[in-house]
């Protein structure tokens, strides 16, 4: 498994393997194991300075005075590593993955793009989105539909509501993450109780206990900021956001979704501000999500409105007609935009991939790549590899060449594979007789990387001989 491989490579200090896993296999740099440890922690603990610097430069988190930051500092094996950690300036994972979902939600919170309500807490304003608050909290859903209904500004003057704690609460509702100074933890717990966020309350209590034990057992450490992060496989945030996609579905396409948390699409609903018409179906959506997730929709909705139509009735959201897409395919776009996930059957993956490319949704393209990877067989691997090349899906391309390496002795007899090798050779500009061919190099790499025992050496040599014989037979030397 790639995640286990990442932790093992960090303990060994294998920078090349870690780089491959992060950049080619798309493994999350801040993933945690069952001991709540990160790849950066193991790199620090085992004294691999070069790897520590690489991880920090690629989005590994190590904020000062947090539990993770202090733990890395305390466990660091050398002074140069400690200096690197103290000099750390956060580089977010969005530098590697431009559409990173957590980064999108954080920007939505900080910038308030297309917000429709402002909370003023003791004079400090907080711009927010009714749809997100309602989807994440039944308390906010009820208040926005009753006491705060129709209000664009909500003033909160209660003396026990701390603006810092309220801001942290919004951060949790938007991102599933919470950063709060230890001096404000009690204020945050009070708000969590008031808003009936029992999961947050449990997480705060558990984190306080863990930090207290850590500080007591590690003299000299100082934790000033408490950080709550959802576990890697935690579905709560995305499941809540997917409720907004449920509400956006036309009634004729809703199927067996069951009882929804809001009366969709009438009444309170999810407060949509844009309607996408796809064929004969209307999807009631939110500009904040579509503009924030896609440069295509940002240009369409913010920069100009050439394809919009006048609303059918006063108060209805404006309508934009989308062409060259069916409702069945748009549903996958919809769920990805809101929840960063969609259940994508392999037979639809290529159609969704083409639309994701048109709508500038690289993350959805990667999901399509994962689905296409399920189709890898001797008969299909070359075709899937061509798709990966065409749509620049590096992980899928790597998976294809890895599979090719396993079945290379059969592939060399297939005309589609031979033609792919010829095309790759021709694509190398001004190729000399001994220049390498990328496809061949990748297959060789995966053949060599599988060698773990003496018996595997002979098998690898047989595979490489089959590949070399093919190259000779078609007049290529590389």
Swiss-Prot record:
Residues 451-477 form a coiled coil. It is found in: Cytoplasm. It comes from the Eukaryota. GO terms for molecular function: translation elongation factor activity. SMART domains: ANK, BTB. Residues 115-182, 272-346 form the BTB domain. Its main location: cytoplasm. It holds the Pfam family BTB. The keyword Repeat applies. Keywords: ANK repeat, Coiled coil, Cytoplasm, Elongation factor, Protein biosynthesis, Repeat. The keyword Cytoplasm applies. ANK repeats lie at residues 1-31, 35-64. GO terms for cellular component: cytoplasm. SUPFAM superfamilies: Ankyrin repeat, POZ domain. May act as a mediator of the PTEN growth-suppressive signaling pathway. May play a role in developmental processes. This is Ankyrin repeat and BTB/POZ domain-containing protein 1.
